[in-house]
Amino acid sequence: MKRQRDVRYAVDKDESDDPQAVTDYVVDLYKYYRDAEEKRPMELYMEFQQDINPKMRGILVDWLVEVHLKFKMLQPTIYLTVQIIDRYLSAKQIDRNQLQLLGVAALFIASKYEEIYPPEVADCTYITDHAYDAQDVLDMEMTILRELDWNISSPSAHHWLVRLARVARAPESAAHRAEYFAQRMLQEYAMLEYKPSLLAAAAAYLAMVADEGCDDGWPRACERLTGYTDVELYPCCKAISYHINRAAKDDAKRQLVACKKKFSRHDFSTVSFGKCPVLKRPKLIDLPDLAD
């Protein structure tokens, strides 16, 4: 991966008068995100677990995506929820009858971090069909926070997707498709192999290739932002395509349907109806990206 240069993108120049764009700090912010990625969960933590497996994790995440949609939460919340789960499971063994409790407590924590109006603890017990009571959720919340040493914040693929869409000036449909690819990969334990920045870059690349409003290729602006060339993205792109296309026939059997259903909605441009492109050859294109 190439070292990112200190560059100013054209989109930042255009938005320099918008205080919410924080254009004076955005380069430093994404340098921080890159450094913080090194604290991501262990890739092979299931080898340490004795009573759960990747299939159970996938079903849990699928259910959480459904709950996340039902509660109309912000997109960063589901990413943070799954990160909390994986970070906890990287350090602690858990019984399968406590896995859903871990998931709902992680969602409870993430929502209080990301949402303006997080759900009440009573809502969390309700969505589990009262399999756990309020005290169970609160106890698990404290257990998680102590294990993570109260360090909740962690950069996700969503942070990178937002920036990539702006830098590439991607249409809304491409941004939605990249979000779909990235959120669908939250369910796949094997995808923990890839850093959030790499996963986001690969999802964005595939989305731009699939979208009729985008040129076929990896914009140089995106390469400069992430530090990844199209060649470096190829293995992750291939994995995403596999899980969405070849494994699609097994999703119903594995009960992984919530993400596809969520992104079939019109407010997400119905992007889950389409297939994920399969890249045969990396192709680099050039787009204007640097401010004068």
Question: What name fits each language-model region?
Answer:
Residues M1-V104, F108-D292:
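Acidic, serine/threonine-rich low-complexity regulatory regions at protein termini
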